[in-house]
Amino acid sequence: MNRATLSMGVLAVVLGGWMWPVAARSESRAMDVSRSVLKIRVFKSGLFSALAHDHEIEAPIEQGAVETAGNPAVEFRVDARRLRVLDPELAADKRAEVQKTMDGPQVLDSSRFSGISFQSMSVEKIDAEHWIVRGNLTLHGQTRPVIVTAIQKDGHYRGSATLKQRDFGIAPVSIAGGTVKVKDEVTVEFDIVLAE
């Protein structure tokens, strides 16, 4: 089975304030969706990659919860239709083109596959600030196992993932006979805050 390994960082896929210090208190806590976000970084490649751009994409986490009673667990969901291409260096019309391609059937097909979600299967505490979370990530209608190494700092829980688009049934965009394209690997970054 394909496996993506999530490492400490920052996007920002796969996952946030899950059973960290709150694990000692048996309770379920929601994520603060006004401050919790997912980011995807897409990188250029190809012979004429100097003419292309890397892309930064962001969406709010739509809902999520942490269960600290019994077996710690975490789950969250992002609406793929709310992903937005940031790319401040691109002109508005070019940014709109990238957005349209990303949303369309060639890439995310977000009108058909609107849900991006993660559900943990096990949680292992490494030390006071670090955890390893094993679970399943669903993207583009495909579910794959992932391993998340997460870190807590200043009330935020951050992690990052390097995923292969092809593992989730997405063919990396390629134009001009492949002289300009994006890499199969993308970085997914998470910044998650628990609700008060």
Residue ranges: model-predicted function:
Residues 1-10:
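Bacterial N-terminal signal peptides that target proteins for export
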Residues 9-18:
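Bacterial N-terminal signal peptides
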Residues 22-196:
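Low-complexity, acidic/polar, glycine-enriched regions of mature
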